[in-house]
Amino acid sequence: MEEEIKETSEDKEEENTEAEAVENNEKSEENAGNVEEDEITALKKRIEELENESADMKNKYMYAMAEAENIRKRTAKEKADSIKRANKGLLLSLLTFMDNFERALKAGEQDSNVQGSEYYKGIELIHKQFIDFMHDNGVSEIESLGEEFDPNVHEALTMIEVPDIDKEKVVEVYAKGYKLNDELLRTAKVVVGKPAAAKE
């Protein structure tokens, strides 16, 4: 009987041990499930953080690229404007030489000894080349003589009364005006004729 009790108590111990093992195994699986859920939650959170970080970096990259493009465009525009200003300054300076050629030609027209000479023909040729050069670079003369006075392109040096006109018109040009493409390069210096005052 003693043996039976021993066997029974050993069986019970074995059953208890097995039950504990099963219980521990269940708890272990439960804990493992909780650990897996915690790991999954942590990984999802980390993925979300990395996605946000990636989106932020992408936005910063796009902003930097747009800023670089704006700087490139602004620099190109500033360079073009600088070249345009330099060209305008040079062409404006050359107009003085053009004026002097025209004065020389006008003086030669009044002197019959000079008019047919090789010297005069040379000045005419150089003047023509000068005009061609200016035209090739976008410079064009502003037609003024006989035109209605326009303060945007004409500078009135003096005004005189002229019969038989109803509006102010340019009656004499002292210095021609010029445009560079569509932009005013130099105003024409002119004498303006105004309608004669009515006599009482």
From Swiss-Prot:
Gene3D superfamilies for the chain: 3.90.20.20, Head domain of nucleotide exchange factor GrpE (2.30.22.10)
PANTHER family assigned to the protein according to its UniProt record, in alphabetical order: GRPE PROTEIN, GRPE PROTEIN HOMOLOG, MITOCHONDRIAL
Superkingdom assignment: Bacteria
GO cellular component: cytoplasm
Family of the protein in this entry: Belongs to the GrpE family.
Region span, Disordered: 1-39
Self-association state and partner proteins as the record states: Homodimer.
Composition-biased stretches (Acidic residues): 1-23
Any Pfam family the entry gives: GrpE
Subcellular location: Cytoplasm
Xref: InterPro entries: GrpE (IPR000740), GrpE_coiled_coil (IPR013805), GrpE_head (IPR009012)
GO molecular function per UniProt: adenyl-nucleotide exchange factor activity; protein homodimerization activity; protein-folding chaperone binding; unfolded protein binding
Protein role: Participates actively in the response to hyperosmotic and heat shock by preventing the aggregation of stress-denatured proteins, in association with DnaK and GrpE. It is the nucleotide exchange factor for DnaK and may function as a thermosensor. Unfolded proteins bind initially to DnaJ; upon interaction with the DnaJ-bound protein, DnaK hydrolyzes its bound ATP, resulting in the formation of a stable complex. GrpE releases ADP from DnaK; ATP binding to DnaK triggers the release of the substrate protein, thus completing the reaction cycle.
Keyword line: Chaperone, Cytoplasm, Stress response
This protein's name: Protein GrpE
GO biological process, alphabetically ordered: protein folding
